[in-house]
């Protein structure tokens, strides 16, 4: 037989079926917390400690502007100015900005404190300064209207507020300044003439000739004296550099480089008349060493080396050589595979790229 008896089970509280405990909301918890701290009895403070009741400012010093009643509103920063204490703003500074305009008078009952409100509502529909159909209600409003009229004459309000044509105002100011200084408005065509490029048929001025290189202008635009001086040349300088051009010996000594700061010439660029070029320079010698004399023939598909640019006309060239060559449109640049095939003994072939 079992002598230990039944096994003791822990104590379990029997649960009631069908009842779920609801958790309080935050509002209920806060209400219970604040309600516990609230004093049991609320005593009113004594009359001496109470603040004087706030009395609205008298409606006599408040002016309702026209911006609330009509479209001719000139407000500040596009905000509607509904009321303005003109007497306080135009005073000599006796009132402190933080102090109220009128001393606060305590009223025995709150009903009397609300009496000025309907009065101010009645005056909202009145035009300031007594300019309405009826006479002004008080002499202070007429005085405020007089102050507003004087202020408007001093400030010139139509020019100090928006809805203006700024471009027209700026143009009028410029025209008035020119008329006051010079007596008339100058012709804009004469002013803008210096900003426009010169006409192709006109001769450039002295300043334009100094700034513009000679190869930009055509031989017709070069002055006659400079053209003759450049064509004659000088024999003061000699160059011991060996000649590599195809000019005859008799013609080499007659031509010399010009005195002006002209860029070096390029005799390697083929020209029909080789007798028109001057003596070679060190740059020509380097080009004769490094550059190929004859370019390779073009391929059947029309890809070849870029053609050399035609040499611009200069004062040293005779008129016949200028008419010999004709400019042609630039040819397309050769492809990379063609350049590699020309410089390598073996033909380079690249397989087509596959996109994955």
UniProtKB/Swiss-Prot annotation:
Keywords: Chromosome, Meiosis, Nucleus
Main location group: nucleus
Localization annotation: Nucleus; Chromosome
UniProt cross-references to PANTHER family, sorted A to Z: PROLINE-RICH PROTEIN 19 (PTHR37346:SF1)
Polar residues bias: start-end ranges: 1-12
Region annotation (Disordered) ranges: 1-53, 95-143, 216-255, 312-331
Subunit annotation: Interacts with CNTD1.
Short name of one Pfam family: Pro-rich_19
Record-level GO cellular component terms: chromosome; nucleus
BP GO terms, sorted: meiotic cell cycle
Protein name listed in UniProt: Proline-rich protein 19
Residue ranges with Basic residues bias: 19-29
UniProt key word Mitochondrion: no
Gene: PRR19
Function of the molecule: Promotes meiotic crossing over formation through its interaction with CNTD1 by participating in the crossover differentiation step of crossover-specific recombination intermediates.
